[in-house]
């Protein structure tokens, strides 16, 4: 079905010790969207990108290498609900830095 596509929130595969890039391998051009967030020590707690230990920079590099050109969003969750502007700015700044390090911008 052309209307059914894949999406990956990168924390659950990380927590389950699965390869995030395996989603791209399995879904190919049906992999349509990513929720980019960080995590730490196998916990499903969502952290601002760059503030945990998920290898986001390496993932971004691989996404660039395979030609991923679809959508991605930064996910802010309840830990950051009281001051979303502050945390959104920090998340965007961190992502810009990670993207630059991965050679995307």
Model regions and ranges:
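Histidine-acidic metal/acid-base catalytic patches
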Residues: 1-105
């Amino acid at each position: 079905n052309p209307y059914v596509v894949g999406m990956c929130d990168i924390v659950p595969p990380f927590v389950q010790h699965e390869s995030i890039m395996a989603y791209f391998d399995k879904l190919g051009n049906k992999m349509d969207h990513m929720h980019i967030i960080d995590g730490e020590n196998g916990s499903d707690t969502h952290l601002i990108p760059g503030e945990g230990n998920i290898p986001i920079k390496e993932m971004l590099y691989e996404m660039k290498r395979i030609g991923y050109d679809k959508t991605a969003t930064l996910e802010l969750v309840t830990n950051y609900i009281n001051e979303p502007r502050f945390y959104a700015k920090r998340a965007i700044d961190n992502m810009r830095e990670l993207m630059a390090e991965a050679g995307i911008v």
